[in-house]
């Protein structure tokens, strides 16, 4: 178990960005969805201050390990595909889950979905009016952003050696389906007010606030 007060927090670059995603969750949020929760560290972090956290993952063994790791955390663990999942306690199925969550977050999972545009549309529909969507994801390397990709690759190697990388148990998918330019195009077409920002370590942050 890693949910006890004396448990040491593992580290990798995905876990590093959990704090950034948590900072995008409104302080008064009551219901939060973590999409592609993987090993469960972000969901557990959110559960410390949010009363109703749902953690969704399509990989059953990974989800079970997360459930075991954070057995005492008040989290609803859901196995399923975000495009069709039903959410317990929301009083809604896949077709009528519009606006069910005050915040929807996702860390290093969006690139696992084949259709990025459809996935972003689905995530945005799950956000309640005035709520937030925050996604950290990867993009496909491109010549246009070659310097950023190279710098990120060097930085990743250095920080992993210094801090000691904890290997996650979730499946790896590479390369991502979209370049940064393509991802920005998807976001601009669906969520005109959203921001897409490059991060160090080769990640991208998508942040959006739903209209009231």
Feature names for model-found ranges:
Residues 139-186:
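C-terminal alpha-helical "lid/dimerization" subdomain adjacent to the S-adenosyl-L-methionine
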Residues 105:
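A conserved beta-strand element that flanks and buttresses the S-adenosyl-L-methionine
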Residues 131-137:
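Conserved beta-strand signature within the Rossmann-like core of class I S-adenosyl-L-methionine
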Residues 118-129:
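A short glycine-rich, Lys/Arg-flanked "PGG" loop and its adjoining helix->strand segment in the class I
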Residues 84-98:
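Short conserved loop adjoining the S-adenosyl-L-methionine
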Residues 39-84:
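Class I SAM-dependent methyltransferase SAM/SAH-binding core
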Residues 12-30:
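Conserved alpha-helix/loop element of class I SAM-dependent methyltransferases that forms part
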Residues 30-36:
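Conserved class I S-adenosyl-L-methionine
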């Amino acid at each position: 178990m890693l949910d006890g007060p004396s448990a040491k927090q593992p580290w990798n670059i995905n876990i590093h960005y959990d704090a950034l995603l948590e900072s995008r969750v409104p302080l008064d949020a009551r219901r939060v969805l973590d999409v592609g929760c993987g090993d469960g560290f972000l969901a557990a972090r959110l559960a410390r201050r949010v009363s109703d956290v749902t953690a969704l993952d399509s990989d059953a063994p990974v989800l079970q390990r997360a459930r075991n790791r954070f057995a005492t955390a008040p989290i609803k663990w859901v196995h399923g595909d975000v495009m069709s999942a039903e959410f317990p306690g929301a009083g809604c199925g896949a077709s009528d889950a519009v606006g069910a969550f005050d915040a929807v977050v996702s860390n290093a999972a969006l690139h696992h979905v084949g259709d990025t545009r459809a996935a972003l549309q689905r995530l945005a529909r799950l956000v309640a009016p005035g709520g937030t969507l925050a996604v950290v994801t990867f993009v496909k390397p491109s010549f246009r952003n070659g310097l950023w990709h190279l710098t990120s690759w060097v930085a990743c190697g250095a920080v992993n050696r210094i801090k000691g990388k904890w290997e996650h148990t979730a499946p790896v998918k590479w390369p991502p389906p979209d370049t940064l330019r393509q991802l920005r195009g998807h976001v601009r077409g669906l969520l005109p007010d959203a921001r897409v920002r490059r991060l160090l370590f080769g990640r991208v942050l998508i942040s959006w606030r739903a209209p009231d």
